[in-house]
A protein has these predicted regions:
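Juxtamembrane helix-loop transition sites at the ends of transmembrane segments
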Residues: 243, 276, 321, 411-414
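Composition- and surface-driven signal marking solvent-exposed, interaction-prone regions
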Residues: 245-248, 393-396, 410-413
Length: 418
C-alpha cells in the first residue's frame, strides 16, 4: 500500500507541473546522463556523444525551466522549438561528427558489411558455429562481429555503403537509419489521435532524449524498429489494418524485437466497422517476413539459425557485447546451465500469467496490450542470458505509448469475436 501511495503521489506531482517544466526536468536529467556517460564510458562513440550532448541538453533545460514558470499562450510551439534544438544538438551534430571520425558501435559495421554482401548477391549469414568453433570468421575482427543477428531486411541500411570500401558521410548506415526513423516516426505522430502535448512527449522519448539520441548517433539499429512499431500502433489506433500490417511486417522482417507487438496486434486490430481484421494483418506480416527471409533460410538454414537465434540468445559459444550485468547474464556466468534455462522457464510462466490476465480483462484494448508488452520486455531483458541495458528503450517507449493513449481516452481497438 505504501508503494502504491508513493506512486500515486509522484504521478500527481508530475501531472501538476506545466508541460515546459516537465520538459526542463527531463532535459536536465538527460544532461546529467550525458555528462556521466562522457566520464565513465570506455567506448569512443558513447563518451564523445556524452560530451557533445551535455551542452545542448543543459541549455534547453534552463530555458524550459525558466519559461515554465510563466503562463505561455503558445506553450506547445515553444516546446516544439526546444525539441528541434535538442534534436539538432544531441542527434544531428554528434551524428555528423562521429560519422566523420568513423566512431561507431560494432553493429554499424556489421550492417554495412551485410549490405556489401547483399549487393554482390551473397548471403549475409556467412559465419556460424559448429562443434564449438566459428566457421568463416572475419579475420582481424572480434568473433562476434562475424555474426549478423538480424533478419535479412536489415541489410538494406548497409546498401548505400556497398560501393565503397569504407562508409563515409551520407552512406554511413547510421545516417540511413536516422532518416528512416525520422520519416516513420513523423508519419506515425501525424497519424496518432493524441493531443499536441502528448505527441511532443512521445517524440522526446523516441528521438530527443538519450533513449533515442544516444542510439541514433552511435548505433541506431533499434531506432527504425521502434519508429515502425510506433507507426503500427498509430495505424491500429486509426483502424488502418493494411498500414498496420505493412509497418509491423517490415519491423518484424528486420529484428526479433518487433515480433511481440506484431503478434500481439492480432488481438486488437479491427476495421472502422468494429470487426476483427486479424487475418488480413496476419497475411501482411507473414508475407513480408516470408518474402524477405525464406530465400536465405533455404540457402543456409543452419547459418541462419546460428546468426538470428543462437547468437542473440548467447547459445553460439561466442563472447557477445550484449553482456550487461543483469540477473540473467550474471546467473549464466556463474551457472551456465541454469542461466540458459531461466529465460525459457520465465517465458513459459510469464506466458501463463499473461494469458490469465488477458482472459480476465477481455477484450484487450490497445493501451492495455502495450502495457503488457512493456512489462514482458522488461522481464525478459532481465532474465535473458545475453542482453544489454540499451534494450530498456523498448519497454520505456511501449509504456509511454500505453500511458498517453490511456490518459487521452481515445477510442481504442478491441477484439470483436465473430
Amino acid at each position: 500500500m505504501r508503494f502504491y501511495d508513493v506512486r500515486e503521489r509522484s504521478k500527481a506531482t508530475w501531472q501538476s507541473l506545466s508541460a515546459l517544466t516537465g520538459d526542463g526536468l527531463l532535459y536536465a536529467l538527460a544532461a546529467c546522463f550525458a555528462l556521466v556517460l562522457g566520464w565513465t564510458s570506455s567506448q569512443p562513440a558513447q563518451w564523445q556523444w556524452g560530451y557533445l550532448a551535455v551542452g545542448p541538453y543543459a541549455l534547453v533545460a534552463m530555458v524550459a525551466l525558466v519559461l515554465g514558470r510563466r503562463v505561455l499562450r503558445r506553450e506547445n510551439l515553444v516546446r516544439l522549438v526546444l525539441l528541434v534544438v535538442v534534436v539538432v544538438g544531441a542527434v544531428f551534430i554528434p551524428l555528423g561528427l562521429e560519422v566523420q571520425w568513423r566512431h561507431a558501435q560494432p553493429e554499424v559495421g556489421v550492417i554495412q558489411r551485410s549490405g556489401q554482401l547483399l549487393s554482390k548477391g551473397k548471403d549475409p549469414y556467412r559465419a556460424y558455429t559448429t562443434h564449438g568453433r566459428v566457421v568463416n570468421e572475419i579475420p582481424g575482427l572480434p568473433a562476434f562481429e562475424s555474426f549478423f543477428p538480424y533478419f535479412p531486411l536489415m541489410s538494406v541500411f548497409g546498401l548505400p555503403s556497398a560501393g565503397t570500401k569504407e562508409a563515409k558521410g551520407l552512406t554511413d548506415a547510421r545516417v540511413v537509419m536516422t532518416l528512416m526513423t525520422l520519416l516513420a516516426s513523423g508519419f506515425a505522430l501525424a497519424l496518432l489521435r493524441l493531443s499536441k502535448q502528448r505527441k511532443i512527449r512521445v517524440a522526446q522519448v523516441l528521438i530527443a532524449l538519450p533513449t533515442g539520441a544516444l542510439f541514433l548517433a552511435t548505433g541506431g539499429d533499434d531506432m527504425p524498429i521502434l519508429a515502425l512499431l510506433l507507426l503500427g500502433v498509430a495505424a491500429l489506433q486509426r483502424r488502418q489494418t493494411n498500414l498496420a500490417g505493412i509497418s509491423l511486417g517490415l519491423a518484424a522482417a528486420m529484428k526479433l524485437t518487433a515480433w511481440p507487438l506484431a503478434v500481439g496486434a492480432l488481438l486488437v486490430v479491427r476495421n472502422e466497422g468494429g470487426r476483427s481484421t486479424w487475418k488480413r494483418l496476419l497475411v501482411w506480416v507473414t508475407s513480408i517476413v516470408a518474402v524477405t527471409t525464406l530465400p536465405f533460410v533455404v540457402r543456409a538454414p543452419g547459418a541462419f539459425i546460428s546468426n538470428v537465434f543462437a547468437f542473440p540468445l548467447g547459445l553460439a559459444g561466442v563472447t557477445s557485447p550484449a553482456a550487461s550485468a543483469l540477473p540473467g547474464h550474471i546467473l549464466t556466468t556463474w551457472l551456465p546451465t541454469m542461466g540458459h534455462v531461466l529465460a525459457p522457464v520465465t517465458l513459459l510462466i510469464g506466458g501463463y500469467f499473461l494469458s490469465k490476465y488477458a482472459h480476465r480483462h477481455w477484450p484487450l484494448t490497445l493501451s492495455r496490450l502495450l502495457a503488457l508488452l512493456s512489462v514482458s520486455f522488461a522481464v525478459m531483458m532481465c532474465v535473458a542470458s545475453a542482453t544489454r541495458i540499451g534494450y530498456i528503450i523498448y519497454p520505456l517507449n511501449l509504456a509511454l505509448w500505453s500511458s498517453v493513449m490511456q490518459e487521452q481516452r481515445v477510442e481504442e481497438p478491441v477484439l470483436v469475436v465473430v
